[in-house]
């Protein structure tokens, strides 16, 4: 029974060989497998570490190259993109404003002459005039007119008032006096009738009607003169 319990399907059991060496062989196989796996893991780790280190080493170089490329590119520099603003001195500004009040548009020779006088370039003078014209148009309200237009309109508004106050006497050509004394009254009466007819037939709005002898009443220096109807002709 003891021999039957030791029987198995292994080669050693069939050949009746001792089974003591079976465990050391398994240990040797395990030992041989462990170094192989360890070597494989070390190789993989070294590969990944070398790739990471190489990436870390090359990243500063890449960043420096990118920085140099950005510096060399013309559109990346903010100082180059931003236009340099021209600062005018007080004397230059006063002269430009004085010339702008005289003349808002300059020709090319005038622009060059003014730029030479102020030690500027013609382009700077041209841009200053353009900006000043734009500011003037933008700051002007729609209802505000030019100073010349305002003066002309004030003169037009003031003209009717002056016409109302100033009365110009109309001189009527008198006929030569006759030798008869009767001609004195007959020559003056038709004149008064004509003046009265003109005053009533042609009324002017805003003007007051004056009588035949009231025109001289506006001028104190001529009040001592009598109306034409009262003058007697002595020949």
Curated annotation (Swiss-Prot):
Any GO BP annotation: respiratory tube development
GO MF annotation: an example: RNA polymerase II cis-regulatory region sequence-specific DNA binding
SUPFAM superfamilies: Homeodomain-like
Keywords assigned: Developmental protein, DNA-binding, Homeobox, Nucleus
Principal subcellular localisation of the protein: nucleus
A Gene Ontology cellular-component term: nucleus
Location(s) in or outside the cell: Nucleus
Membrane-traversing stretches: none
Function noted in UniProt: Possible role in the specification of a distinct subset of neurons.
Listed name of the protein: Homeobox protein Nkx-2.8
